[in-house]
Amino acid sequence: MEEFQGYLELDRFRQHDFLYPLIFREYSYALAHGHGLNRYMLLENIGYDNKSSLLIVKRLITTMYHQNYLIISANDSKQNPFFGYNKNLHSKILSEGFAIIVEIPFYLRLISSLEGAEIVRFYNLRSIHSIFPFLEEKFPHLNYSADILIPYPAHLEILVQTLRYRVKDASYLHLLRFFLHEYSNCNSLIITNKSISIFSKSNPRFFLFLYNSYICEYESIFLFLRNQSSHLRLTSSGVLFERLCLYRKIEHFAEVFANDFPVIPCFLKDPFMHYVRYQGKSILASKDTPLLMNKWKSYLVNLWQCHFDVWSHAASIRINQLSKHSLDFLSYFSSVRRNPAVVRNQMLENSFLLNNAPNKLDTIVPIIPLIGSLAKAKFCNAVGHPISKLTRADLSDFEIINRFLHICRNLSHYYSGSSKKKNMYRIKYILRLSCVKTLARKHKSTARAFLKRVDSEFFQEFFTEEGGFISLIFPRASFALRRLYSGRVWYLDIIFINGLSNHE
């Protein structure tokens, strides 16, 4: 195992990094229940000492606390006999306080790792659209993909054990374990769900931290196996992985691999292996044969069952051929298809034509699931016929139009990377007519009569792209303009899936 030590260059927590005393500080929970920890405040203050002591952490929390001026009131008649306070409110405050305290060492380690790096600020790297340029570059050259649904551990002890390798304060971990079990008994904290949508709306930060700790552990092991199984390290894959997981690998992996993975089989050697993930869904793609993909499938199932004690079955990993199946990822249907092109080549006096058919990644708007989301939100019926939005009929005309425009622009912004715009035009058409019917219902008229009374440019913004009109109702738009805005655009300010697009 000395050979693997070189790959596991990991930071250690100092022995004086104790989190336990912060649990009994009122301002920790006041800060957590207020605006929360500003994730960028720590990144902007790079001048902190790398050997983050307890004094530095306390000063940091105190400074942020004085900026919030939040006072907690514990007066409530409904009290939990264990905590002594309101069961719902103060359990939420405690969970958020635990999360914000345990996050502090991770952010200070992140600051230390970013010192001297070329890129200190990573705002644009947080965009989920940054994944698609990577897919466009790599996936057309690959053959098979595995759609992976990452299982979530239902047992609380697994989550505590995951944190144990990162947080060295035993007192804090014991109290955290006790709190998790008590809180889960009172509020049903841990919920198992096949789609991993287990985050509670009342405690999103706490759930997010527990889930990210588990994912960080799993992906660190997976990345280690990936690097060991290939003679060539792919820079692009490594960079993308670091975007999604900002923490470094941790030291205990050497012991883990010695026990659970004594030998990495030679049949896993593949320099064309790529991996992307968002939330609980990931994609593993390879240029090799289905045999290798099935070997990785078996390996991942054993990893979850043996190391994390999480039950997983083969159905959670589906292997498909990229040229025949579409990937349902980030609310896009992505597929690899041939893009035939004829190139005229001339050499001296001779000219000839070359038929070229390179592979291209198609990203398509999933029209059927999206119409289902619109129907659920009462913009249309199940087959896509627009209907009036009854809940907005009592608003002013300006507010109604503004809200419909806001939804339309957000969807257009998110699906700007679609290679085929026809489906997006249909969604805009549904929203436009739904807006018309809502206004007509308010004015006690029909949609046709209402459209005759308003100006022709009244709903122009529904079909406005950034720079021109690209829609079915503007047939005279220039060919150059249509061609310019029919291409794909990936934005670096999208950090989550649009609500209507999130149909999973």
Swiss-Prot record:
Keywords: Chloroplast, mRNA processing, Plastid, RNA-binding, tRNA processing. The gene is matK. One of its GO terms (molecular function) is RNA binding. It comes from Quercus gemelliflora. GO terms for cellular component: chloroplast. One of its GO terms (biological process) is RNA splicing. It holds the Pfam family Intron_maturas2. Usually encoded in the trnK tRNA gene intron. Probably assists in splicing its own and other chloroplast group II introns. Transmembrane segments: none annotated. Disulfide bonds: none annotated. Belongs to the intron maturase 2 family. MatK subfamily. It is found in: Plastid, Chloroplast. This is Maturase K. PANTHER family: MATURASE K.
